[in-house]
């Protein structure tokens, strides 16, 4: 584990790369260090000629990236995709999908207790705005998990479903194992830093691909905002805003649009983003992690990469 963490720290600087597109199958590579898995190369016939030779992308901020077609298992490019990362709040994708699958009634009411907030203020955890003794619907907690990244919503769902956060984390790790997320281990539902709470960009891509097959999850993650009904504490309800769409007022990219995503940040993880977009009728998943620059480099990088994919897709139609 220590060796994997040391390997992870080597890649905090921005990375210059280009992409080659062959019939919408793009291969992203580090300049001078080709990362083209043999299994991927075998899928691409030597007789096919690339219609776009090189699409140079300016220096980006990520140190780990995986991009794949959402409808298939084909990875079209990666930078450090199997290296250990701290997933931060991308963890909440797993929290949400496990909760959705475990809940028998999304309209059931759950009361948040003061114990559920223990340690959240001290660790400066992001919260959705619910209060102790507030009774809310499970569906509103799910929106609170995915849009504003509310830690109290994660704990409330975990307690209600499994009796404790620890019990719920067992379900998360079981799901990770079932999905083949071999480089992942969860310690909590929130993504707050723990050295033993880790994943890989490739594993998060596997997770997001699985989660967006669920209609409820998809509706939640694609929502720019959500307003709850009134509660005993907030009679006018609460309106949540997506932490991704907040920084992405126009999700349009060349040839399509970014449909949804989950951001993450801790001091150790850097800025992270797991997102997906539809470009020229094909859905793509992009997971980036390890951006330590100021501003919103995780979102800027996603827009840049999706735009390049769109340009490549449009170039195919001009042939």
Question: What function would you assign to each model-found segment?
Answer:
Residues 16, 36-63, 75, 164-319:
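Penicillin-recognizing serine hydrolase domain
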Residues 11-13, 24, 55, 70:
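Intrinsic disorder/low-complexity segments enriched in polar/small residues
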Residues 24, 93, 277-279:
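Hydrophobic alpha-helical segments, especially transmembrane helices
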Residues 1, 24-27, 39, 174:
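N-terminal cationic amphipathic segment used for targeting or macromolecule association
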Residues 36-202, 211-212:
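Active-site-adjacent loops and short helices of periplasmic peptidoglycan-processing enzymes
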Residues 1-16:
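N-terminal Lys/Arg-rich, disordered targeting/topogenic segments
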Residues 18-33:
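Hydrophobic membrane-insertion alpha-helices, especially the h-region
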Residues 28, 149, 161, 309-313:
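Structural signal for hydrophobic packing residues in well-ordered secondary-structure cores
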């Amino acid at each position: 584990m220590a060796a994997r963490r040391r390997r992870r720290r080597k890649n905090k600087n921005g990375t210059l790369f280009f992409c080659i597109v062959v019939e919408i199958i793009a291969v992203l590579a580090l300049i001078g260090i080709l990362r083209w898995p043999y299994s991927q190369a075998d899928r691409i016939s030597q007789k096919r000629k690339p219609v776009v030779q090189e699409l140079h992308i300016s220096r980006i901020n990520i140190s780990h990236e995986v991009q794949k077609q959402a409808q298939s298992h084909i990875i079209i490019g990666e930078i450090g995709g199997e290296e250990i990362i701290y997933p931060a709040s991308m963890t909440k994708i797993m929290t949400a999908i496990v909760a959705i699958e475990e809940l028998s009634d999304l309209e059931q009411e759950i009361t948040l207790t003061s114990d559920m907030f223990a340690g959240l203020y001290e660790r400066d955890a992001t919260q959705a705005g619910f209060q102790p003794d507030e009774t809310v619907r499970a569906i509103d907690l799910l929106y609170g998990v995915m849009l504003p990244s509310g830690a109290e919503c994660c704990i409330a769902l975990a307690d209600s479903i499994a009796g404790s956060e620890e019990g719920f984390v067992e379900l998360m790790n079981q799901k990770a194992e079932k999905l083949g997320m071999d480089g992942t281990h969860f310690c909590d539902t929130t993504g707050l830093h723990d050295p033993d709470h880790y994943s890989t960009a490739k594993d998060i891509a596997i997770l997001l691909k699985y989660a967006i097959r669920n209609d409820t999850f998809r509706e939640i993650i694609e929502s720019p905002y959500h307003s709850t009904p009134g509660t005993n504490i907030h009679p006018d309800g609460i309106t949540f805003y997506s932490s991704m769409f907040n920084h992405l007022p126009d999700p349009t990219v060349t040839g399509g649009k970014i449909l949804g995503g989950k951001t993450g940040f801790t001091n150790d993880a850097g800025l992270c983003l797991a997102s997906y977009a539809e470009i020229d009728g094909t859905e793509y998943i992009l997971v980036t992690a390890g951006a330590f620059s100021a501003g919103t480099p995780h979102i800027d990088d996603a827009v840049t990469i999706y735009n390049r994919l769109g340009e490549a897709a449009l170039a195919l139609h001009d042939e």
